[in-house]
UniProtKB/Swiss-Prot annotation:
Keyword terms of this UniProt record: Cytoplasm, GTP-binding, Hydrolase, Magnesium, Metal-binding, Nucleotide-binding, Potassium, tRNA processing
Name by which UniProt lists this protein: tRNA modification GTPase MnmE
Occurrences of domain TrmE-type G (ranges): 212-351
Cell location: Cytoplasm
GO terms (BP aspect): tRNA methylation; tRNA wobble uridine modification
Cofactor(s) the protein needs: K(+)
Stored CDD domains: trmE (cd04164), TrmE_N (cd14858)
Gene Ontology cellular-component annotations: cytoplasm
Function (record text): Exhibits a very high intrinsic GTPase hydrolysis rate. Involved in the addition of a carboxymethylaminomethyl (cmnm) group at the wobble position (U34) of certain tRNAs, forming tRNA-cmnm(5)s(2)U34.
UniProt-annotated binding residues for Mg(2+): 226, 247
Binding site for GTP: 222-227, 241-247, 266-269
Cofactor: binding comment: Binds 1 potassium ion per subunit.
Entry binding sites for (6S)-5-formyl-5,6,7,8-tetrahydrofolate: 20, 77, 117, 424
């Protein structure tokens, strides 16, 4: 396998740039650059030179022999000055060395997976953690990247193995005419594990956390949707005009309130009729956004919004109007009245829609595998042929193996590690 290298720190210019090298030629590359290799896992100052002996930079270098490191292979880290020219010169020199090449996106992490340093669930958690933008996302995804989810699944797998051992024992000590019954405790254990998996299947998934709670602003034209949208974003993201129908498309913006992620969605004004084909497309898109919404803020006439929509009286600063009799909130985007209360209510509602801080969450792929395992356990019944019971347990165990990557496909791995940046 070729030795790979890449810049693992932020894009230059920066105070420090960290270049990683991983593979069998890592030690030789360090020796060629620095003239000597320092003691393992001890930082040392070295002058780096190119193949002609010209100085590239003075850097702190680390020699990290495998397998007890990030990738499980021999590794080197070069902590150099973070200027563009310095980084480019060092990478250019590395590229001329036999057996070395630039790393592909996610290739360091993929090698860590291949060498057993992390499992698939940890890799998926790390991929999501790299794109975490809010505190809640960081807390939940850190738990998955740190191995808590893998420990949990490993425990479930061990329980299935123990159940399989009981079935195999019963098969070994039975004859063709008199198959021994499994103990009642066996079925209790199966039911308990199935219920535990079922509880996990009810929890919010990572995708919901990644995208945030979808909040749609809906109502007729000129109801104040875009004004409220801008007020919550604290920016002029949407055009606001007294002309009805100014907003003709769906406008989405991510935002975090107190570390909780949301996606705010402004929509075209809803009304019947109209000969403008572009406006009709905007209305159709608005209705589609309503179908996918977690929360709808209804700024139209009271009682005319979708079921479970929040009735918002968004023009509390205007005297000549027909006020809603029982709105959830009265507010004014112009004066700021009620905006803080709306944000508090949104955050409170999000607690039931998103994983809680410190929780472990699964993604759609992992959810499907847990569902498969739970379904197999649910098929196990008293009096069932023991060979059928054994097959249900084997399939459940296979689902757990695919969860952590004991069994997987190259296409799925390509898709996962392709999400990483170069150098990770």
């Amino acid at each position: 396998m070729e030795t790979i290298f890449a810049l693992s720190s932020g894009a230059p210019p920066a105070a420090i740039g960290v270049i990683r090298i991983s593979g069998t030629e890592a030690r030789g590359a360090l020796e060629a650059l620095a003239g000597s290799v320092p003691d393992a896992r001890k930082a040392a100052l070295r002058r780096l030179r190119d193949g002609e002996g010209k100085t590239l930079d003075d850097a702190l270098v680390l020699w990290l022999p495998g397998p007890d490191n990030a990738t499980g292979e021999d590794c080197v880290e070069l902590h150099c000055h973070g200027g563009r020219a310095v980084i480019a010169a060092i990478e250019r020199t590395l590229g001329t060395m036999p057996g070395l090449r630039r790393a592909e996106p996610g290739e360091f992490t993929r090698r860590a997976f291949a060498n057993g340093r992390i499992d698939l669930a940890e890799a998926e958690g790390l991929a999501d953690l790299l794109f975490a933008e809010t505190e809640l996302q960081r807390q939940v995804l850190q738990a998955s990247a740190g191995g808590r989810l893998s420990e949990l699944v490993g425990g479930w797998r061990e329980r299935v193995l123990a159940l399989s051992a009981q079935v195999e024992s019963a098969l070994d000590f039975s004859d063709e005419d008199d198959v021994d019954e499994l103990a009642p405790a066996f079925y209790t254990d199966v039911s308990t594990l199935a219920d535990e998996l079922g509880e996990w299947l009810e929890r919010p998934q990572v995708e919901r956390l990644r995208d945030g709670v979808r909040v749609v602003f809906a109502g007729p034209p000129n109801a104040g949707k875009s004004t409220l949208f801008n007020a919550l974003l604290q920016s002029e993201a949407a055009i606001v005009s007294p002309i009805a129908g100014t907003t003709r498309d769906v406008l989405e913006r991510p935002v975090a309130f107190g570390g909780t992620p949301f996606t705010l969605i402004d929509t075209a004004g809803l009304h019947e009729g109209g000969d403008d084909s572009i406006e009709r497309i905007g209305i159709d898109r608005a209705r589609a956004a309503l179908r996918d919404a977690d929360i709808v803020l209804w700024l139209g006439p009271e009682g005319e919004g979708p079921d479970n929509a929040w009735e918002i009286d968004a023009q509390s600063d205007i005297d000549e109007r027909t006020a809603k009799s029982a709105p959830r909130l009265r507010l004014s985007a112009k004066t700021g009245e009620g905006i803080d209360a709306l944000v508090r209510d949104l955050r409170d509602a999000a607690r039931d829609l998103l994983p809680r801080p410190g929780d472990v969450a699964v993604n759609a792929r992992q959810h499907a595998l847990l569902s498969e395992a739970a379904g197999e356990l649910a098929e196990i019944t008293r009096g069932q042929d023991l060979l059928i019971t054994a097959e249900h347990l084997r399939t459940a165990r296979s689902a757990f193996d695919r969860f952590t990557g004991r069994a997987t496909t190259e296409d799925m791995l390509d898709a996962l590690f392709g999400r990483f940046c170069i150098g990770k």
